[in-house]
């Protein structure tokens, strides 16, 4: 039986919600197109994203169709809708459609890669990663090492920001050299497109190139990627790349595109969890799914991964279309967000009397996120002293200090106050004893939002300096 696209319940209503003529001007006037609470100022788009009302209507239409006729929809219509979104995202990324499938999030994609790789039995394989790796992916590496009982190990590459791209490249080459000198085999590298904390653009293109030269598998964690930066997959040609669509592409949570070039698809034998598409090496179990026709085993494997709601995946094509028709396309969107992040971050730094996290070549803010130093530092940890550089020592001068043992208490207090009193959220971290706040630019924000953020953070920091965070302990 060949499934064909059918008109879905609520489809006309959803289409009507997308009839806005564009491109619309960016800034706060665009907020009416989104489902955000008017009382909430979303300065942290990078963590979970959000969606336009038009895409929410699309999501509901797919869910309604699934409930109206469960078996026909899940068995026959789902593969068609997945193919439509796969075609749309492949066109956006300029890659062959047979190289892309969907998973729930980037963490699942990284897990899928690391748990499918067959590690060498001689125990020499190493996984390389930077110390700015996303926490869940770092723990995935830890799990794989435990699960494989010693046949694979890891090597963490420390970075000191604001690092130059050349410094990152040099650190990676040095890690490869040390690995081999110690009798190890650098087998796979996990590489960010934009790291989480701090939120900075990473020279992933250069690192992938080195991986090719050194015959190391490149696994690119583009959790912060599609919809924010040009991934240039065709030029970069990574071995694996995963990018969350629900963060910057305006698709519902959770949804990520998983890119695997044909040359590597044989390495990904199982989805997570293993489902009907798995082909065992021994035996032949019954597969109850509708035959996939001329699709590859890789694509067929990811069409049904247990009974889950795939509606966010179906919305990818709708989100791409909405961004083109209403917002004017990817280039216009990215240009606005990057400019706002750079200029808005500088404004916040001026209000706080600090600085943004940027290197001398200006490569860290080639994205929609910016990190601003807060006007205090964390006291030295006697168990793990950090030797600051001359530049860092100068930055510390004249700032007040939070004792190391009170840092987490201050973090928790600041988060609670931002949420409860200011109706916003700003992720913060400390790197090299310095507190940093990460802000996300987006098309529905403008400079006034960053000015507000600067004043809010200034008030918050003044209250921290007075020790107010201790009162809630």
UniProtKB/Swiss-Prot annotation:
InterPro entries: Aminotrans_V_dom (IPR000192), PyrdxlP-dep_Trfase (IPR015424), PyrdxlP-dep_Trfase_major (IPR015421). Ergothioneine (EGT) exhibits antioxidant, anti-inflammatory and cytoprotective properties, leading to its growing application in the pharmaceutical and cosmetic industries. Also shows UV and gamma radiation protection activities. Finally it acts as a cation chelator and a regulator of glycolytic metabolism. It holds the Pfam family Aminotran_5. Its cofactor is pyridoxal 5'-phosphate. Coiled coil: none annotated. Keywords: Cytoplasm, Lyase, Nucleus, Pyridoxal phosphate. It is found in: Cytoplasm; Nucleus. It catalyses: S-(hercyn-2-yl)-L-cysteine S-oxide + AH2 + H(+) = ergothioneine + pyruvate + A + NH4(+). This is Hercynylcysteine sulfoxide lyase.
């Amino acid at each position: 039986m060949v499934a064909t696209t059918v008109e879905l319940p609520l489809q006309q209503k959803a289409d009507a919600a997308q009839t806005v003529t564009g491109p619309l001007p960016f800034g706060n006037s665009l907020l009416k197109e989104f489902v955000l609470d008017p009382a909430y100022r979303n300065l942290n788009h990078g963590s979970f994203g959000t969606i336009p009302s038009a895409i929410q209507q699309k999501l509901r239409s797919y869910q309604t169709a699934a409930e109206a006729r469960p078996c026909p929809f899940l068995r026959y219509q789902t593969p068609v809708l997945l193919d439509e979104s796969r075609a749309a995202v492949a066109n956006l990324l300029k890659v062959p459609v047979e190289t892309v499938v969907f998973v729930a999030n980037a963490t699942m994609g990284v897990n899928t890669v690391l748990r499918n790789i067959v590690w060498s039995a001689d125990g020499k394989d190493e996984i390389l990663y930077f110390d700015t790796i996303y926490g869940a992916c770092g723990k995935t590496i830890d799990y794989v090492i435990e699960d494989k009982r010693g046949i694979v190990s890891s090597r963490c590459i420390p970075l000191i920001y604001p690092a130059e791209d050349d410094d990152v490249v040099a650190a990676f080459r040095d890690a490869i050299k040390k690995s081999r000198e110690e009798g190890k085999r650098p087998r796979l590298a996990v590489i960010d497109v934009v790291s989480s904390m701090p939120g900075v653009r990473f020279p992933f293109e250069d690192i992938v190139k080195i991986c090719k030269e050194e015959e190391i598998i490149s696994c690119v964690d583009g959790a912060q990627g599609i919809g924010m930066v040009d991934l240039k997959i065709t030029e970069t040609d990574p071995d694996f790349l995963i990018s969350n669509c629900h963060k910057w592409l305006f698709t519902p949570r959770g949804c990520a595109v998983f890119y695997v070039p044909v040359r590597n698809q044989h390495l990904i034998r199982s989805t997570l969890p293993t489902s009907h598409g798995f082909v065992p090496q021994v035996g032949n179990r019954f597969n109850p799914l509708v035959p996939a026709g001329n699709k590859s085993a890789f694509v067929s494997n990811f069409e049904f991964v247990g009974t889950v709601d795939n509606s966010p995946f179906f919305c990818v094509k709708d989100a791409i279309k909405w961004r083109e028709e209403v917002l004017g396309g990817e280039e216009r969107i990215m240009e606005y967000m990057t400019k706002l992040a750079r200029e808005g971050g500088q404004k916040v730094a001026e209000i706080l009397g600090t600085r943004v996290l940027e290197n001398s070549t200006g490569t860290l803010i080639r994205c929609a996120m910016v990190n601003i130093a807060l006007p205090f530092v964390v006291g030295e940890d006697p168990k793990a002293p950090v030797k600051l550089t001359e530049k860092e020592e100068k930055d510390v001068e004249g700032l007040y200090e939070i004792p190391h043992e009170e840092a987490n208490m201050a973090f928790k207090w600041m988060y609670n106050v931002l949420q409860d009193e200011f109706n916003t959220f700003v992720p913060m971290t400390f790197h090299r004893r310095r507190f940093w706040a990460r802000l996300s630019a987006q098309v529905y924000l403008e400079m006034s939002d960053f000015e507000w953020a600067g004043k809010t953070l200034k008030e918050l920091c003044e209250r921290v300096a007075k020790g107010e965070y201790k009162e809630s302990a």
